[in-house]
């Protein structure tokens, strides 16, 4: 009597395993995130993603570092911000029919240069003025590209609780 019961249980386990395997293959292929076994596509982020990943956090950190008069960190963040703009201009050379390198140049070149001087001289007032100019340049670019609703401001608080912006003592 045990033989037929065990045989039936083994058969049920085999059928259940096969069903799970088929369903998991079907689910992976139908996943909204794509097939995990597929070859990766080239990374092609959109303008908004690049701004959120590369530009906005660096703009914020630059402002926080300058506000704390942490000039080495401010200099580093300025370099990172310049590199971020270069990546954006290369990754998306034209956006909405407009030349991105020219937009970036017109919006931020002068304030970035003034920020560089202020940081090297460790001159807080000039830093604040240049940073305000950078922020206005960002917003002017947004207005030019019909995104005036994206308003950047001088940060009033840190969104990076795991980073100290005051200079080390």
What residue ranges belong to the model's regions?
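Sequence context surrounding c-type heme c attachment/ligation sites in exported
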Residues: 30-169
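Bacterial N-terminal signal peptides that target proteins for export
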Residues: 1-13
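Boundary at the C-terminal end of the N-terminal hydrophobic targeting segment
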Residues: 20-23, 29
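C-terminal ends of transmembrane alpha-helices
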Residues: 24-25, 146
């Amino acid at each position: 009597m045990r033989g037929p019961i065990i045989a039936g249980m083994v058969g049920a386990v085999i059928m259940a395993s096969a069903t799970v395997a088929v369903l998991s293959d079907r689910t992976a292929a139908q996943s909204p995130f794509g097939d995990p076994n597929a070859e990766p596509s080239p990374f092609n982020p959109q303008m908004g993603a690049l701004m959120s990943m590369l530009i906005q956090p660096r703009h914020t950190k630059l402002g926080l570092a300058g506000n704390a008069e942490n000039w080495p960190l401010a200099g580093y963040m300025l370099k990172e911000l310049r590199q971020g703009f270069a990546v954006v201009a290369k990754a998306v050379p034209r956006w909405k029919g407009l030349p991105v390198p020219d937009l970036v140049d017109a919006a931020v070149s002068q304030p970035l240069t003034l920020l560089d001087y202020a940081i090297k001289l460790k001159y807080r007032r000039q830093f604040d003025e240049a940073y305000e100019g950078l922020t206005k340049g960002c917003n002017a670019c947004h207005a030019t590209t019909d995104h005036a609703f994206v308003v950047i401001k001088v940060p009033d608080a840190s969104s990076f609780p795991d980073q100290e912006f005051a200079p080390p003592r």
